[in-house]
Design a protein with these regions (language model features):
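Transmembrane alpha-helices of multi-pass inner-membrane enzymes
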Residues: 16-22, 378-388, 396-418
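Alpha-helical transmembrane segments of multi-pass inner-membrane proteins
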Residues: 112-115, 145-176, 187-254
Length: 418
């Protein structure tokens, strides 16, 4: 069987698996455990046996939909299961992986450091440790020349499209009200919004810079941008909307297209915004933007308490941190998240951990220093994760989709660099 025919069959197969995943829409009960195990095996075995380079995009797509989708999913919630899958798969197929990627040395150091601090200081491995280890091993499944690059972009586009459809079809009937403004969601709308924003930015880059391999891909990208932008407005997450907006501005301003086309794109976006505003899509977002709460829904109070707890620690703790588990319970009875990745890294992993985090963020910039064609997309995606980390803690919280998004940024920078 030719490689082209094999991949076509695998695409059809995984499209069917997506339909099965999305067909379970109960928000209160998961499928029976035997059925979930069979589904998981059916999901990973074809990729492992026939196309190992597809395993990572498949896991990234299905774990995101399982986490942020409307229902209790076929996909397990325990991250150690995915670490086991990736580790066993790598052991089985390593000899078949020719000219594969390697994780950045600085990322390896960061991963070892974080896991060590959590194990020694927190006395347990937590979600961030499992997510880091999963991504570290995932690099080995990726080719150096990037022939599967479109699969990774398509992964985040599919995530955005399906989550958008969930939002518009089931959003009102199955949502849980989370604010007095009427904003509704079945998961945290801030994390949900940023995950959808990832696909919007990638799709927008495909459309503006004409990177689609065929016209069908381009049409899907256009649909993604349209659906995703409308979702982000109606989802009313200020942070997610800001992250997406900044990234899109960077892509537009620094894209390769002519000035006349950039002006046309800006006018088209402006018309879209006016249309959505006229239809009332901006109502909840506008109300939240005009909110006079100077604490950012209590975020500054949390930051102050956590920072005070950090300053009360000894020098060793300030340098190397206290681990995620102890940081979660620091200063606030019952425990509470930081709502800021930078503060979370500082408290949980010390000054050393925060510096290492900035180093892994800066790594893709180093790769594109001499690659002007890839600078806009890499800078825009880095700006996206840096902004969303200001009011959330997706990375210290161990959100696997966000770590896979970081991995994609590295790959986009590397594929151009090599």
């Amino acid at each position: 069987m030719s490689e082209r025919r094999l991949y076509r069959r695998l695409y059809i197969y995984y499209f069917f698996m997506l339909i099965v995943l999305c067909s379970w829409v109960s928000p209160t009960s998961a499928p029976p455990m035997p059925l979930r195990l069979v589904y998981l095996l059916a999901l990973v075995l074809p990729a492992i046996l026939k196309a190992p380079n597809m395993l990572v995009p498949v896991l990234a797509c299905f774990t995101a939909l399982g986490t942020y989708g409307i229902s209790c999913s076929y996909m397990p919630t325990e991250k150690w299961i995915y670490l086991l899958i990736v580790a066993v798969s790598l052991f089985l197929v390593f000899s078949r992986l020719k000219s594969c990627q390697r994780p950045p040395i600085i990322f390896v150091v960061f991963c070892i450091y974080v896991c060590f601090i959590d194990f020694i200081r927190g006395e347990e491995l937590v979600d961030i440790d499992y997510s880091l280890l999963i991504v570290l091993l995932s690099f080995f499944f990726v080719s150096k020349n990037g022939y599967e690059k479109d699969n990774y972009t398509l992964t985040f586009i599919i995530i955005t499209v399906i989550l958008s459809l969930f939002f518009f079809i089931y959003g009102q009937s199955s949502a849980v009200e989370v604010s007095e403004t009427g904003r509704r969601s079945w998961v945290d709308p801030n994390y949900f919004g940023n995950v959808c924003g990832m696909g919007v930015v990638l799709a927008y880059n495909v459309v503006v810079n004409k990177l689609a391999p065929n016209r069908y891909f381009n049409k899907i990208a256009i649909i993604t941008v349209t659906l995703g932008m409308l979702l982000l407005v109606m989802n009313a997450s200020r942070g997610a909307f800001l992250s997406m907006s900044v990234a899109i501005v960077v892509v537009t301003v620094f894209s390769k297209v002519k000035l006349k086309k950039k002006i046309g794109i800006a006018l088209l976006v402006a018309l879209g915004v006016i249309a959505m505003y006229s239809l009332g899509a901006f109502d909840v977002l506008t109300e939240r933007l005009m909110d006079e709460d100077i604490t950012g829904n209590g975020r500054t109070i949390i930051w102050g308490a956590k920072m005070q707890g950090y300053m009360n620690g000894d020098t060793f703790e300030k340098l190397f941190g206290i681990g995620y588990s102890k940081g979660f319970y620091l200063a606030i009875p019952g425990g509470f998240g930081f709502h800021n990745d930078y503060l979370a890294f500082l408290v949980d992993y010390g000054v050393v951990g925060l510096i290492l985090f900035f180093c892994i963020v800066a790594y893709p910039l180093k790769l594109v220093a001499n690659s002007p064609s890839k600078r806009p997309i890499v800078i825009s995606l880095l700006a996206f994760i840096l902004i969303c980390s200001m009011t959330l803690e997706p990375f210290t919280y161990g959100r696997l989709t966000y770590w896979y998004f970081y991995m994609l940024i590295v790959l986009l920078a590397r594929w151009d660099h090599t």
